[in-house]
Amino acid sequence: MATNGFRPEYEDLGRYEDILGQLPMLQVYSHIMLPFAMPEGLSQDTIIADLEAAVRQIRAHVPWMAGKVVNVGKGPDNSGRYIVVPCPPPDPLIVVRDVTHAFPPYKEIQRLKAPNSMLDSRLLAPTNAFPQRFEDSEEDPFRVIRLQASFVDGGVFLDFVTQHNMTDAGGLFGFARLVAMAMRGEQFSDSLLEQVNRDRRNIIPLLTPDEPMLDHSHHIRPPITDAQPVVRPDPARWHFLRFTAAKLAELKDLASQTMTPDPEVPYITTDDAVSAFCWKKYITVRHRRRNTPDARSRFSRAMDGRKVLGIPAEYMGDLVHNVTTWLTFRELVDLPLGEIARHMRRELNRANTAYHVRSFATFIAQEPDKSTIAYGGRFNPDTDVGSSSVLRVDLFPVFGKLGRPDFIRRPNFPGIPFPSLLYFFPQNPQGECDSLTCLTDADMEALNQDSEWTSMVEYIG
């Protein structure tokens, strides 16, 4: 059922304060960028008008997306609360830039498959990005949503940006899908608005006193002191990789054939197989340099808690928890792919539960100073891998007259690398999965010389 309005309670911005979004590490912006070829006869003015109309429709029906995020109550040993408050609309509603002078024609970008080296955030993004914190100000408010359209010869890049305390990856992609719906001339259904504007305050039932909390100590990061300063990793850069549909299927078949029977693991997924492959190869090339077979490596997978909590995919708040698998360097080098994938799936089956999400939320809720909590905790980029996969998410909808995007990308923020991070983006209509990873030059050079790696992975750059 379509609607032109919404319930009055949606305007109560207090309903959008949740628990998992209270981490100071989320005081950042998340970006997803979609490049499009300009259809014949479609003007820039028409695209801009359609985008602005879409943003107006979203602001009118999703009040929290029209606001900004502020931190209140912060003090000694207390990280405060992140809440959304009203904010005047930006003028103009979206950022528009003509960057034709700085880019080759879009057909050339298509031919090169939009490598990361071409995607300069100084030109294509309206603001900074994770892991760089954003500070709210009168001149530049910490808006919940931002959108930039950057025009090149024959194409346009749309950069969708959301505030991370208010949305996880599901919410970021949800913002892009709302824009696509509005550009197709669709109204937002009552059921969609119910989830997008859902009351977040009690969406995760905390543990009761008689329910034991699980161990989440690995999410505590060490304090930064003179005695224990921040360790600066080797220089690292972001790279795009591609797994074709055939290679994804080949990896899954290989993993399935080399996995020993396990009653806890009735099956493994494509996600398990490709994650295990990357983990194995990353550590293999590092082991050749380090020769530390007994060193422990951690693979941390960000998991969407919606399904286990019975919450629809359209819900846009933070519902991420992490599942961790530990193996030694020796195991990762020597074990067949299927055994590594089996270990990962077993840990996921054990931890990807409603109880685990409730326990993690309780852990966060009980800690006044949440600045010590991080998804990666004591993350060591030389031994560990942090991963987020949305391989199965559909993010190639039709954006009205613009049609479907050609790629899913993220602007390149070269000054803020995060070594050993790995994103798997949604598969395109051809079944190809593009991956964004941040690796040291030594790691990337070694991988590109590894025949097993290059037989499975196309390097885009």
UniProtKB/Swiss-Prot annotation:
S-S bonds: none
Keyword Transferase among UniProt keywords: yes
Signal peptide positions (record): none
Residue spans crossing the bilayer: none
Molecular function GO terms recorded: acyltransferase activity
Keywords, sorted A to Z: Acyltransferase, Transferase
Induction: Expression is under the control of the azaphilone cluster-specific transcription factor azaR.
Domain of life per record: Eukaryota
EC assignment: 2.3.1.-
InterPro entries from the UniProt entry: CAT-like_dom_sf, Sec_Metabolite_Acyltrans, Tri101-like_N
Associated pathway: Secondary metabolite biosynthesis
Pfam families for the chain: TRI-like_N (PF22664)
Entry keyword Iron: no
Function statement: O-acetyltransferase; part of the gene cluster that mediates the biosynthesis of azaphilones, a class of fungal metabolites characterized by a highly oxygenated pyrano-quinone bicyclic core and exhibiting a broad range of bioactivities. In the first step, the non-reducing polyketide synthase azaA forms the hexaketide precursor from successive condensations of five malonyl-CoA units, presumably with a simple acetyl-CoA starter unit.
Family (UniProt): Belongs to the trichothecene 3-O-acetyltransferase family.
Protein's UniProt name: O-acetyltransferase azaD
Species assigned in the record: Aspergillus niger (strain ATCC 1015 / CBS 113.46 / FGSC A1144 / LSHB Ac4 / NCTC 3858a / NRRL 328 / USDA 3528.7)
